[in-house]
């Protein structure tokens, strides 16, 4: 996230998380919140959505943010499966990555390198 803020100038960043009861997800959410606050960006609950760690979760999460008119400068995804699903749905609905927004995942899976 530091890179998204300091290099790319992102000011609206949505967190696409896994299960709200998952310990790793909660640590990533805390890091997201802490980074925003360090850079003077307000934490907004409406920019956070939890589901699961599957690719289909990224599709659901993107649809949620699009329907709520909350497309950010960047999406920070709790894992690469979510990021791939999100990127897939974004492209299906006419968005251009990275022109319209940036997406980052977590885990460094091979399939994410194609996005």
Task: Give short role names for the model-derived ranges.
Residues 1-115:
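Bacterial carbohydrate/catabolite-sensing allosteric modules
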């Amino acid at each position: 996230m530091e890179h998204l803020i300091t290099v790319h100038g992102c000011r609206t960043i949505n967190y696409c998380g896994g299960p709200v009861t998952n310990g790793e997800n909660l640590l990533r959410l805390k890091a997201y919140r802490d980074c925003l606050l360090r850079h003077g960006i307000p934490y907004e609950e409406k920019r956070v959505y939890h589901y699961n760690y599957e690719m289909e979760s990224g599709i659901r999460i993107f649809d949620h943010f699009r329907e709520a008119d909350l497309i950010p400068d960047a999406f920070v995804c709790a894992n690469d499966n979510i990021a791939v699903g999100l990127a897939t749905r974004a492209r299906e609905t006419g968005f251009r990555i990275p022109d319209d927004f940036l997406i980052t995942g977590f885990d460094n899976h091979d399939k994410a390198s194609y996005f």
